Amino acid sequence: MKLKSLFTGFFVFGLLSQGFAAAAQDKVLIDFKQQGVESRIKDNGPDTKFAIVGGLNGNVLEVTNTPGTNGYPGVKIAPDGAVWDLSQNSRVEADITNLSDTNITICLRVDNPGDWQTNPWNGENLSLAAGKSGTAKVNFGYSWGNPGFKLDPSKVSMVMLFTTKPKKEIKFRVDAIRAAGKAGEKPKGSIEKVKPKDGVILEFTKGFSENQIDNRGSKTVIAGNSAQITFSTEPKDKWPGAFFKTPEGVIWDLSGCNQVEFTITNNGSKPARIFCRVDNNNADGKKHCANADATIEAGAKKTVIVPFVTDKIWDGEVKNSGFVFSSADVKGFLVFVEQNGEEKKITLDPVKAVAAKGPTMPEWLGKKPPVDGKWTLTFEDNFDGTTLDMTKWTLPNIRENITEDTFPIEIEGEKSWWGSPSVHVAKNASVEGGFLKLKTDKPKEIPEALPKFKDIKYTTTVVTTFGKFTQKYGYFESRMKLPTTVGMWPAFWLMPDRGKDAGIWWKRQDTTNGGMEFDIMEYLVRYGAYHYNAAFHWDGYKEKHKSIGTESIYFYTDKDGFLTSGLLWEPGKITLYCNGNVVGTWKNDRIASVPEYIMYTMPIGGWGAGCNVDDSKLPAYFTVDYVRVWQKDEWK
């Protein structure tokens, strides 16, 4: 599982605005001239000092950060009461001057109450040269220029100003902090993500503007609800085409789909090979795009399908290998041909994005490993009973039963180590109808028998083979149905277990010295329904931590809505499988060489923005149909 930083992304440069002009609707959040105002300001650690001092236009706040242990030194400013009600405004602004002799970047953060691990804030950075002034702006609902946490402006509980850990002493002055803008205003240059209604992304009737057409060696005429495209025959236009881009300020979010369909009629007198492409920013035909082509007979109509599920394979030894594309960030569609001197004309009907079922799964899937050899089935659970087989699995245990060998996450009521605070509860794992189900929920209250944590809202569980089954090398496969509730973070993964002779649990599970975390299938619901990642972590989780992986494994589900993920682990080599197809490989001497055990988890959260839980969709379930492990005789 990826370990996320408290301040992920804080240092992407934000939108800057110079000058300290105040509008009529501005609301002062803190008056530095007010007696006793210091009580509303706190440092963010021992490496920050602050003072209210006299300025040219009244009192100001001076903040000094020094090198030390705090990675994000700065100040926290509280309201004069429980919260600020800024529902009449659209943003918070801070007028800041850099008093240092070096360039600095200051983050302005605006918070709602709540668990910090759910990131209930918006933030923006301001970069200032030595001696320069500027205004940092945080627009409600946006962070670092992109849509972020949906902040409630009526419940602003804190404003923070901080920097990264400085190499030498730095100082900045805050002249004013205010709420500004009218409620509902969007920041200039902001982007709205739009999901297709009824699957239709691009239609040519109401709402379509011809400004969305970029003719690249073509002529396009809108006729009814279709586009008539005539491609150039000029020798200079080798690949003439028409690009249909999103409206200004819009990105198409196709994360709920796994392919795009272009219905095209060939109006020419000869067969024509038509290329269709779905583009992100910076698409170059190989990266940041998905594409397909088809030959259409003269006078015929055909649907060209551009799948997000491709045969491009991630290679851990090749930078930016595999399928580099984001279905949630589509900027437009390109329809083009290869020019051969013959006139080509087509009609393009409305373009649709769909969630299609995949082809029939390979016959071998679930029955044997994907490569030949002398294999033995060493572990299997089809979850056909009514209770979990405790000879194979470990669940969160009551505290009275724990020993020094107990892995802390397997203690009933222990906090989840990943994502938003939740507690592990054994009863959240159940076996029914031939499936293992991991449940994450928000109960009205945490059961009395469990330890009380003031920030705990959710219950989840963890199911592992720790202390019951381990294996070095082999093929590990599981068929799973993923949850649909935003905020869920299910995973099928392996961790080291060197056995009791290695000592206390953390020595058994150390990812150094031949150990490694294998994230075979790791899924954030916010990615969309057909997209997961695989990752590998080693050498601990602190300064020496290393990782590699891919975030672009797109897939079809089978007829029942399941996917099957597999890992072929060989000495010095791993191969990733999705629904029986190779999706990734990595050859490296550092690949794990110690036994590993199986884990299923579904914490809340993840990395990046958009991981907040939709409580109305709870409980959420991560469903496992089976898990099977084979060992090759030569590795026993």
Question: What are the language-model segments listed below?
Answer:
Residues 6-8, 262, 632:
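General helical structural elements
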Residues 358-636:
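GH16 jelly-roll
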Residues 16, 48-51, 113, 223, ...:
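A sequence-level detector of short, solvent-exposed, charge-rich linear segments
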Residues 8-18:
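Bacterial N-terminal signal peptides
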Residues 22-367, 422, 436:
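Beta-rich carbohydrate-recognition modules and glycan-binding surfaces
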Residues 20-21, 26, 306, 376, ...:
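A subset of signal/propeptide-processing and intrinsically disordered low-complexity segments
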